[in-house]
């Protein structure tokens, strides 16, 4: 048993969460639609939001019942879950869907009953039905980018816990900030970012992801091809593992690069001292951006405006590197990824370890692990089992990740 008092960081909160794009393949499949109707015009509405574990949640009313939906700009359309169906949904065919790991499948499409968000009611809004990727979380569904694609300008301001929606094209004309044009691919927004040197890439603006920035493996290869040794200098570690969980399962086992970006440029604004890693899914600029400023999306101009809270041309991020991540393996919590320079590795955690017990409590499912009532500052005794079936114990103390 390793008996060392150290930091236990709850890392599930930084896993990339959802990316959905819809790719019709033939006449038998339904097509993407955003022609739902609105009950109001010439309006401005301020909606109170929840900002929890680095994501934006909206109160949505359907059939007189209030639901809690994630606002995910990386999702082309709304999503509801098979294990908690919403009454009144009408089948609308099948559609091809791609998740955060790049996996694709054909899923059921439905038309939702009238949906009310603030003072706005949407009629004819479509949603896909998915299995819940991580059970035990209080999420009833997803509102996707079609809300904005429909023509509504939006301002996300987590400091004031507000989402402002309007159909007035000039409502935000006097707002100041750093603006960038976005391009729609598969009905979701991509902006150009500069992670290092002369390399630039189109990156998904994805509030479904909790991270500030994640770089696809393919993008890093392209970056290395363009700037050579300068790209290699970004690497602060390598590991064989997986960390992203999508609706169709966890990503496959592969090499993950741990990166330290001195300067990530987006919206003509510099984010300095950024720790991140590579992913098998899309490169993305995620919801952690909202920690540093408000964001305005203007669909009629196809522009996204970033308003830094510090009112400066650059922001120092200075975040911690992800040192361990957990994924489901056979329904149980498993160490999907571990950084060899991190504290969990020093304590004895290894990739592939299965968590079987915390203190005296047997862990029987990934859901139980995700919802375990950890307390910051308390030490826990983890019992883990490796691939050979050998068990060992590790003491680990949870502290809040900066």
Where are these regions (language model features)?
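Bacterial Sec-dependent N-terminal signal peptides
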Residues: 1-31
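Pepsin/retropepsin-fold aspartyl endopeptidases
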Residues: 25-402
